[in-house]
Swiss-Prot record:
Organism annotation: Aliivibrio fischeri (strain ATCC 700601 / ES114)
Similarity section: Belongs to the thioester dehydratase family. FabA subfamily.
Designated name of the protein: 3-hydroxydecanoyl-[acyl-carrier-protein] dehydratase
Subcellular location: Cytoplasm
Gene coding for it: fabA
EC numbers, comma separated: 4.2.1.59, 5.3.3.14
Enzyme active site: H71
Length: 172
């Protein structure tokens, strides 16, 4: 993909969920409700804590988001696993952005720490992904560290997020 955009809006992300952004063999983002971001203001192959790539994405928080009604009734909070999944989504999106093909699958995470929460009163969640290693050969895989911020305050940190792209997932 020559002259790749360095940012994406909601319509672009929805196109990715339909398989229209990175071509017929590229990875897809999930569709709403599991699409956990509204925009990606930064995509870079050279920035980041390790100089191997950086992604910043944002999710606007409103009290009517689907997960607040069910997690938990009377004590609404965004499930931490959705923030973790968003970070995996962004690692896979980056792999498609650099030209990787296949179906994205989360392969693991080394360590996750939760030190805060996303409440319905929040305004914005920001995800920051710093790539440590990217393999784009027969095997397509990304290894990254990530963090989640709510209204500018760090609340989750993930080390060694791992995502791979697979041509065949039947034996996965």
């Amino acid at each position: 993909m020559q002259n790749k955009p360095s940012s994406y809006d909601r319509e672009d992300l929805l196109a990715s969920s339909r398989g229209e952004l990175f071509g017929p063999n590229g990875p897809q983002l999930p569709a709403p409700n599991m699409l956990m971001m509204d925009r990606i203001p930064l995509m870079s192959e050279t920035e980041g804590a390790f100089g191997k790539g950086k992604v910043i994405a944002e999710l606007d928080i409103t009290p009517d988001l689907w997960f607040f009604d069910c997690h938990f009734p009377g004590d609404p909070v965004m499930p931490g696993c959705l923030g973790l999944d968003a970070m995996w989504q962004l690692v896979g999106f980056f792999l498609g952005w650099i030209g990787g093909e296949g179906k994205g699958r989360a392969l693991g995470v080394g360590e996750v720490k939760f030190t805060g929460q996303v409440l319905p009163t929040a305004k914005k969640v920001t995800y920051e992904i710093d790539f440590k290693r990217v393999i784009n050969r027969k095997l397509v895989m990304g290894l990254a560290d990530g963090r989640v911020l709510v209204d500018g305050k760090e609340i989750y940190v993930a080390k060694d997020l791992k995502v791979g792209l697979f041509q065949d997932t039947s034996a996965f």
